[in-house]
Amino acid sequence: MRDGIYKVDFQSEKDAAKGIAMVRDGNFTGIDQTHVYFGKNEGQGGELSAQLNMLMYARAATGMAEALGMKSAPRLRLNVEGVDGRFVLSGASDAESRSRYEFKAEWVAEL
């Protein structure tokens, strides 16, 4: 994936959200309304994959994330397909092989 800032649609069987992600030197960091995603893209050319960790954060009564309310979730193993600055990352979690996750990412700016 090209280094930069991406507009991302995050989707699972249980949830869907819009967010942003940054990619730099293969490192992926993303956030939406309820989760933080971080990990690494691996491989070259058509053999690109990603391993991401996903953290769900709780919301305080104010609507702000509680720093100590982070809840760990399993690692995601994703295949990456991309054309013209758009990427689709899709796969499952280590804990639930039947679960499906999909991230549709569109490049918007340099870092």
Label each region the model flagged.
Residues M1-D15, L89-G91:
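Tryptophan-anchored aromatic micro-motifs
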Residues Q33-H35, P74, S97-Y101:
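Short acidic/polar mixed-charge low-complexity motifs
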Residues D15-L55, A95:
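N-terminal glycine/threonine-rich, aromatic-flanked beta-hairpin/loop signature
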Residues L55-N79:
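An anionic, turn-rich surface loop/hairpin at beta-sheet edges
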